[in-house]
C-alpha cells in the first residue's frame, strides 16, 4: 500500500498512521490515499490494516484522526487547505479510539430552578431557586431537602465524605455560605457554620485540594477565603467579636481580596495557594494567597460567566455570553493566553467543567437548553450534544468521572452515564 506520489494534482496524499494506544498500533510505513477522504474512509482503511496485521479486535474499533494536534472533521484536502499545509508533505495522522457517547440515565426533578450541582462518589448535591439544598444518590433517589437559606442557592461544594458523615457548603444570594454536616445514619443535616462577610449575593464557591479552605465570589466584587475546619475558626482578628461569632456559629473570612470591578462569577483553585477567578468585568485573575494579591490577569472582550481549571493539562476553559467557550493557558510566556475558541452553542454559555480523568474533555451548558461534550482538540464542533433539558442550562458538573450532570431552569438535573473509552496512552 506504499506508493510513490508523482504529483499533488493527482489528488493523492502520502500518510503515516501513528497512535499512542499501543494495542492499536500498525506498521510504520507510508500509505498512499486519496486527498478527498474523510473519517469514515480513514476508518475503513485503518480497519483493513489492523485486520491484515491480525488485530481483529482493533479492526472493530471506531477512531478519530488528528493532524498537528487537531481533529480532522472534514476531508483531508479541505483540512489541509484551511490550514495552508502543503499537499507535497508526508502527513502524519494520529488516531485515537473514538470517545463513546454518554447515555442518558436519569432526570432528577426539583420544585424550582436548579442553579448548582456537584457529585462526589455516589452522592449528588444540588442547589435551587427555592432556597434549598438537596441530596440525591446517583441511582436517582432523593434523600434529603435542606432548608436554611433565605434566597436562591447558587453554589454547592463537597468538603469531605466518609461512610457515616458528609460535609459540604452552600452559597446563596442571601449573602451567606453555610457549612453543613450530614449524618447518614439519621439522614439529617446540621448547619455547623454560617459564613458571613459578603455584602451582596454569593454566586460561586470552590474548596481547595487540601479541603481546608474554600473560596467564594460575590456580586460585591470580592473574593473571600474561609476555613472549612469544623473546629476552631481562623477568622479575622478582634478577640471579643470573634468569641461572640464563634458562639453563634458564625464564621468570618480568613482573607478578603479586592481587584475585580463587577460580579465574581466563577472561582477555581489551581493549587492550595493559587486561585483563578472570572468576572463580568471581562477579566480572569490568578491570585497568590501567599502574597495576598493578583499574580496574573487576562482581559477578554466579553463578560465571563464561568471558568474551570484542569490540573491534568494546566489550562482554563471559560464560558461567556457571546456563545463561545475559550481555552486559556496561564503558563504562556508571550501574552498569547487564548489557545482556542469553541463555537457550538446558539445562546449564552452559562457553565463549563473539565473532566477529572481525561485531559482533553470538557462539558458546557447554555441558554439554548443544550449540554455539549467537547474535546479541546476539536474547536469547530462538540463531539456530542446531550439532549434533555427543556429550558436554560444553569449548571454542570463532571466531578465523578462516571456521570455528567446538568441543572437548569426546567427544574431538572439531567444525569448522563459517561462510558470510558479504553486509554493506554501512558507508558507502564
From Swiss-Prot:
One of its GO terms (biological process) is maturation of LSU-rRNA from tricistronic rRNA transcript (SSU-rRNA, 5.8S rRNA, LSU-rRNA). Keywords: Nucleus, Repeat, Ribosome biogenesis, rRNA processing, WD repeat. Its main location: nucleus. Residues 13-97 are annotated as: Ubiquitin-like (UBL) domain. It holds the Pfam family NLE. It is found in: Nucleus, Nucleolus; Nucleus, Nucleoplasm. It comes from the Eukaryota. Transmembrane segments: none annotated. The keyword Repeat applies. One of its GO terms (molecular function) is ribonucleoprotein complex binding. Gene3D superfamilies: YVTN repeat-like/Quinoprotein amine dehydrogenase. GO terms for cellular component: nucleoplasm; PeBoW complex; preribosome, large subunit precursor. WD repeats lie at residues 109-146, 148-190, 197-236, 259-297, 299-338, 344-384, 388-426. Required for maturation of ribosomal RNAs and formation of the large ribosomal subunit. This is Ribosome biogenesis protein WDR12 homolog.
